[in-house]
Amino acid sequence: MQYTQWEHRLDMLESKLAFQEHTIEELNLTVVQHELEMARLREQMRLLTDKLKAAAPSMIASQSEETPPPHY
């Protein structure tokens, strides 16, 4: 191969590498944002669950309060 062909191939590889580095950085930022959003949503879900448990007693009777089925 001639020198110019090697230069061209090297330029192409450098260009691809730069693009890949940029893409990886963007993906990393997206993953970090998603992790923060998931943490926020988990905390919100925990708070809502606690609020729901405190606001309304369970509508399901405990085992001792249930009447036995008719076949007993």
UniProtKB/Swiss-Prot annotation:
Disulfide bond sites: none
Tree of life domain: Bacteria
PANTHER family found in the cross-reference section: PROTEIN SLYX (PTHR36508:SF1)
Family per record: Belongs to the SlyX family.
Protein name: Protein SlyX
Gene it is expressed from: slyX
